[in-house]
Amino acid sequence: MRYRLLGQTGLYVSELCLGTMTFGGATGIWESIGNLQQDAVNEQVKFAVDAGINFIDTANVYSMGKSEMLLGQALISLGLAREQLIVATKATGSMDESPNGRGQSRHHLYNQVDASLKRLQLDYIDLYQIHGFDPLTPFEESLAALNDLVRSGRVRYIGLCNLAAWQIMKALAVSERLNLAKFVSVQAYYTIASRDLEREVVRVIQDQKLGLMVWSPLAGGLLSGKFNSADDKGPAGARRGAFDFPLVDKMRAFKCVDAMRPMAERRKISVAQIALAWILSKSFVTTVIIGAKSMDQLRDNIASSRVQLDEAEIKLLDEVSQLPPEYPGWMLAYQGQARAKPPYKE
């Protein structure tokens, strides 16, 4: 297992992060995503940590708090050293039907960090993330609250998820102007079949030296190699069959799978491992979040950390999955040619 620095911090996190969305199986969409209970959760956490993973990501809304509870109990039952683990969770989503049961107000963030700490049975959260954009709460309020949580010791670092490039830059500017704790990481959807992140957000991540945590790297299982057509529901119990998320161009995805399959067959490994290895080959990626419904899935995903694609394979996959030109990107590239090389005169 390799480790990478999280943004501009001095904190090393494993290049694979254990996702916990499959823990709990509450009603609704959560049951279709995963229904792992305590014994299975303990087994997954132990296997991941033994494999070198030191980074675990959860959220208050996952199975409406049950994911955090199961994870917290696993850490205690397994007797894991707290200082050796980086635990991340999130807040923003709706936790109840009260007027202030969602969002990023000081009121909600304070209540939710305390609730998460209680469920996790922890004294502090390593990385506390806003789980999206709240159009009603000014960044000034949210960041001041998060800054206070950092100063109190309940939170050590702060991150964000699923924001547009302009929103990320605005948040960083507010922190700079008011001398508040800054977001150190971005959690975002990125796969070989869905590279939209590269248009704007990746540029911000690189320019501002933020960490990138990739969620749903297999597009909800679509890139596992177990689906054969856009209408295919996959094997029994497949998440895509019941919960068709996240959004992906399925024809584009199958084109990528067709390119990855020979690489997997030559190595006698799964297509999923090739898809994960491609993401890990990108220098702007800090960690890839892997969530599994079974131990077989977890073992297979973790094995991707040992897969090294060669330059020719990466080039082929980059070309197959290349984004179509879009303005202003193509204009910037065209105009940039004039500054690509230093001037020279015989």
Per-range role (PLM):
Residues 1-85, 151:
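N-terminal binding-site loop/beta-alpha segment at the start of enzyme catalytic domains
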Residues 6, 18, 56, 71, ...:
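Conserved, mostly hydrophobic/aromatic
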Residues 1, 207, 231, 235-262, ...:
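Terminal-tail/helix-coil boundary detector
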Residues 22, 60-62, 91-93, 129-134, ...:
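Active-site-proximal loop/turn and secondary-structure-junction residues that shape catalytic pockets
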Residues 197-235, 270:
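Aromatic-lined glycan-binding groove of carbohydrate-active enzymes
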Residues 11-16, 52-54, 80-85, 122-126, ...:
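Short, well-ordered coil/turn segments that N-cap beta-strands
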Residues 27, 96-196, 200:
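Glycine/proline-rich, positively charged
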Residues 45, 68, 72-75, 113-117, ...:
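Generic structural signal for well-ordered alpha-helices
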